[in-house]
A protein has these predicted regions:
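Conserved ABC ATPase "signature" region
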Residues: 124, 136-151
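Hydrophobic anchor residue at the start of the ABC signature
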Residues: 169, 208
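Q-loop/switch helix immediately C-terminal to the Walker
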Residues: 110, 115-130
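Conserved ABC transporter NBD signature motif
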Residues: 81-95, 99-100
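Helix-to-loop junction immediately C-terminal to a conserved catalytic motif
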Residues: 76
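Conserved ABC ATPase signature
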Residues: 116, 155-162
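Catalytic Walker B motif of ABC-type/P-loop ATPase nucleotide-binding domains
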Residues: 180-184
């Protein structure tokens, strides 16, 4: 089932029939109420209501400058909203602190890869900084699955933009978080890599996870409950 909603200067998600009858049950674990965002002297959006249950995929769209990145950064706790509240499992994310952070994986529109480090070093160090220790053998297997076999030890600066993007996306194979916030992660990916990302997200949803993906591309999934949220300027 697909739902969509668009408005001007505001954004609101239609919660009718928003329950997901999948492995994760039927309880909305992410609830956003009257959320607003102001950058400088410009209001990006206001009155955003969102109610999300396990197994839900939200495709976040809108023109450049409409607030997609700001919304994702607010949802992951990196940016404070101008007004409104975000609840996770019934509790305000501000009160949850690190407990909420441990449930979230945020990948920004930049791949976040350190160019002086190898693909292998990037994956292991990034995950260690996020509290996930992985062995060298596991990291090599993940990079192989991401189509980077033979390039694991190369400095990231020698990789193509698409390959660096794959290094960043490799985190999704080793994280154990419930909420994925992905900002334009399909950029610079070929069809094979897009198919791989689709498979990763579908598996995440099947396990009761939630994925909110900001993208300019049409990105359909074959599983889970799909909603569309469009921000406008």
């Amino acid at each position: 089932m697909v739902e969509s909603e668009r408005s001007r200067r505001t954004a609101r998600e239609d919660i009718a029939d928003s329950r997901y009858n999948g492995a994760g049950g039927t309880i909305d674990i992410l609830e956003v109420s009257k959320l607003g965002c102001v950058r400088g002297d410009r209001r990006l959006f206001s009155g955003l209501d969102l109610s999300v249950s396990p197994g839900t995929y939200i495709q976040l769209t809108g023109p450049n400058g409409s607030g997609k990145t700001s919304l994702l950064r607010i949802l992951c706790g990196l940016l404070a909203p101008a007004e409104g509240e975000i609840k996770w499992n019934g509790a305000n994310i501000r009160s949850l602190g690190e407990e909420y952070v441990a449930d979230v994986t945020y990948l920004g529109h930049r791949h976040g890869v350190k160019e002086e480090l190898s693909a292998l070093e990037n994956l292991r160090i990034t995950n260690a900084l996020n509290g996930v220790e992985i062995s060298k053998e596991r990291a090599l297997a993940v990079l192989k699955e991401m189509g980077l076999a033979g390039r694991e030890s190369l400095p990231a600066r020698l990789l193509s933009e698409g390959q660096r993007r794959r290094v960043g996306l490799a985190r999704l194979l080793v994280c154990n978080t419930k909420l994925w916030l992905l900002d334009e992660v399909l950029t610079s990916l070929d069809k094979g890599a897009v198919a791989l990302v689709r498979s990763l997200i579908e598996n995440h949803l099947t396990g009761g996870g939630i994925a909110i993906v900001a993208t300019h591309q049409e990105f359909e999934l074959s599983t889970g409950h799909t909603k569309r949220l469009e921000l406008t300027t």
